[in-house]
Amino acid sequence: AKSRSSRAGLQFPVGRVHRFLRKGNYAQRVGAGAPVYLAAVFEYLAAEILELAGNAAPDNKKTRIIPRHLQLAIRNDEELNKLLGGVTIAQGGVLPNIQAVLLPKKTAKSSK
């Protein structure tokens, strides 16, 4: 007995995705390939976000990924930010961003 996930070489559960597709009333019938493809898409997105968040963690001198790292990863990536534009991440905080007009004036005299 081999799971459909292992047949497809995936970590994400093909059977569970298939069940959700059936239970969700998205269509009358669900093809055999659809849940495999969708599980692969989910897995790719998860890997992409975790990769970026994993890079953000050491930058903040941490060894563990926290919601803040996920937030920074998503908001600093143009495509992920577009995809997850309407998503709020709990405990994510905001991107550091100060409008240019609010910054102190650069004067030629100040360079001592």
UniProtKB/Swiss-Prot annotation:
InterPro entries: Histone-fold, Histone_H2A, Histone_H2A/H2B/H3, Histone_H2A_C, Histone_H2A_CS. It is found in: Nucleus; Chromosome. It comes from the Eukaryota. The keyword Ubl conjugation applies. The modification N5-methylglutamine is found at Q91. Core component of nucleosome. Nucleosomes wrap and compact DNA into chromatin, limiting DNA accessibility to the cellular machineries which require DNA as a template. Histones thereby play a central role in transcription regulation, DNA repair, DNA replication and chromosomal stability. DNA accessibility is regulated via a complex set of post-translational modifications of histones, also called histone code, and nucleosome remodeling. This is Histone H2A, sperm.
